[in-house]
């Protein structure tokens, strides 16, 4: 124990944190953690589902509430599973001089054990073993000389730290770099400014200091109030905190407030739709974002969101303030969780004789395999870095899914030996007819099968989950290599591979933007669904498209695209998008367009007698109203003003959404019976679960 205390004194002197891993039986790990923590004063916060009663603890699911706070020493319990997001978040809260003690299973069997955390990112109902990530993680721990590994049955050996200069902690005054940025910000009359940095670099501190220098009013917003603890330590006491949605609601109600600066901390964790809506209300905005990690990735945020802003100035902070440079804890977790982006990721390629599309001979497309990543870790690093740069919601959860979740398919595109593009697909479909029927009816929603289930539950394509498909989860091309056909080449390659596997279709879900849809359309995809709500992540309406491969896939694509075109006249009342879809002029006078066909009867029966959502049935309801003379006040108000549910409920004297939905279903039932009672009964029986329908036919 003397070495433990000596190292802690060194850590305090050098301003660094250190990781100590206890590996063995569960009870042994806990006992040693208690003994070690008793040797040194500190917070010794436990992140565990099964912490001893005598310690301060919280589960991994609540670690996000700690962001913006600081602790001295902690214990992270990974005996039943590794929540890497919580691990990264916890490490970011530890002060210089701290130990992070990590409890893990016996070293030799760890990679073979079911990991409880897999329930968050795998589509399996039971925990699965995660050998690829655990072996990768173990390698990083063993490769770092400053990590202490104490295995049960072996002595505790703590190597002394290499000699380095004593650490001089920040004294509350801005550093030279912070001073430079503050000077530029104070001189700015308007604009959007972004500070990017890894954790512990003082970006929140700088934001707080800006309020002290501003003569006008400053407001603060962030994903949560607790995330602004450090910012508010340095901010003026009169700088209020606003939740992002509450701030937007206030601005929409009262207009632009008389505010000098809006400070947005950890901006990558706030929906881009909210950010886009907030920007016009404020003359000067300072946003901070972590370069990598668990709140979303700052580099991707810059590429996706900030690149579209006409006036945006980006600053970076590189030197740590809360601990010394080359901190052992930060270093090993950066390596293990692939937080460090390859320096040459966005370097431009050599010119290709002025061609806009790379010759196929220069493009090497290959299938990536998790087994190969253990022997060629640089390939994993490049693939994951590309995904992070192109999708700023990418997190360590995706790294775990990428390495160990079943049904993942990854293809990479190499140019001159460098990986410049990645395509990630996920297996979907293959559900039984009865389960697909229940998904369509809204009775069941099993894990996984994102697009396949949504096509059934929302687009009315009840048999979509029974077909075999692969969904495009992510596609990423290095920023300097775009517009050269790499993305299309990846899709074409995996289309051929899917055809070899006798799959029915490929699918993709994306935030609808005309240029993005143009890309998917150029790859052969057909639009089959537009969601009725804005996505929180993209601020766009969700779109789904499929690329048919088999006869059944072509039938599905044709049915879906024709249904969307037929419904779009009415769906536009809910979804203000300008889609180039084939439509009949004067559609309400076109008998074929407004006739109730079997698809409409199925849809309406699903709404009336099961749990189909109103949004999925809206167009069929509008057609139904043309054919019935019943008053149906709730449905007619819905057709006229579909986005004003609260007002409709109040007009009808109903309390709440549930009561209104119940009334809509009742009125639909009445209309079906009035139109054709026998046909309505046939479809009611079709909608029922198999066993219930059988009982109804044979009472």
Curated annotation (Swiss-Prot):
Residue span(s) of domain N-acetyltransferase: 408-547
Reactions catalysed according to its record: cytidine(34) in elongator tRNA(Met) + acetyl-CoA + ATP + H2O = N(4)-acetylcytidine(34) in elongator tRNA(Met) + ADP + phosphate + CoA + H(+)
Keyword set includes Ribonucleoprotein: no
Residues annotated to bind acetyl-CoA: 475-477, 482-488
GO molecular function terms noted in the UniProt entry: 18S rRNA cytidine N-acetyltransferase activity; ATP binding; tRNA binding; tRNA N4-acetyltransferase activity
Key words, A-Z: Acyltransferase, ATP-binding, Cytoplasm, Nucleotide-binding, RNA-binding, Transferase, tRNA processing, tRNA-binding
Enzyme kind, highest EC tier: transferase
GO cellular component, one term: cytoplasm
Residues reported to bind ATP: 178, 200-209, 322
InterPro entries according to UniProt: Acyl_CoA_acyltransferase, GNAT_dom, NAT10/TcmA_helicase, P-loop_NTPase, TmcA/NAT10/Kre33, TmcA_C_sf, TmcA_N, TmcA_tRNA_bind
Family stated for the protein in its record: Belongs to the RNA cytidine acetyltransferase family. TmcA subfamily.
Protein function: Catalyzes the formation of N(4)-acetylcytidine (ac(4)C) at the wobble position of tRNA(Met), by using acetyl-CoA as an acetyl donor and ATP (or GTP).
Annotated protein name in UniProt: tRNA(Met) cytidine acetyltransferase TmcA
Organism of origin: Pectobacterium atrosepticum (strain SCRI 1043 / ATCC BAA-672)
